[in-house]
């Protein structure tokens, strides 16, 4: 018996009679976006405290680049993947696909909870709202979003503001959290940093005429240039790698963050900017209750905000950063976040 066969045999022998399934599409070792960060937090903070036997199923094939992260993950190309699904009574979706998925359709009656990470009804119209002729978005089906709201016994929203669905569904609000770990010391540079995926609602085209650094996927950057005839002549491109994110954030040659992403559910890039001393330009639709002058939802307004920030000295920038950090401290309680989920998962 090969070593792989031995692992599979042991899994079958050790399988509990009753168990929950936690289902995800990513977040194990390859971190690409906010939903992956959420799943990683679940793995590190919630999974060890669950009081019921469970399996973590990842609905994609395991790659050679995938690494173990302290918890056993069963990938789609594992021979027991479908058997585990068939024999469970409860499925908790940590992060699912944004279009109809056979596995979910076949097990719809078992969906206990579903984590809602974004609002498709908004993000799929982002190109219209930004005046663009092209939409860059991950594969998705608008109708699937409402279908999942109907199917899941409990829907949990990770964002900071209510969605339109809150009017018709009993949605549980558990906002994400962020732990400030940097010194938030203002950086004087006027170069703008963009640390995000280049989907349309992130509005990367705002930086067309501004000195800037992109920390993102090279192929997506090139796609934007080709589809919308953008030059980005004043921009430098750095290939995104999760393990290099902190180093990029710590650089002192960019001091302003392009965080003006419309329809932002939580806003990791805003928290990161504040954490590492980059004064952020944020969208006009994010946390209205915070009074902040540097908000933009158009390219022209973004350029205006950038010019205004360029006129600020370091002390003035520090004042805005300290102000935002104080306002955002309400979303830094990791224990509260963990406890709210455990109350649901362990009930």
Language model feature labels by segment:
Residues 17, 69-103, 113-116, 254-257:
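Short N-terminal targeting/anchoring amphipathic segment
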Residues 37, 297-303, 311-347:
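A charged, aromatic-enriched C-terminal amphipathic alpha-helix characteristic of glycosyltransferases
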Residues 122-123, 161-164, 172-184, 219-221, ...:
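Short beta-strand->alpha-helix junction loop in the catalytic core
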Residues 218, 227-250:
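Conserved active-site histidine-acidic residue motif and adjacent donor-binding/catalytic loop
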Residues 275-283:
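Short hydrophobic beta-strand element within catalytic cores of glycosyltransferases
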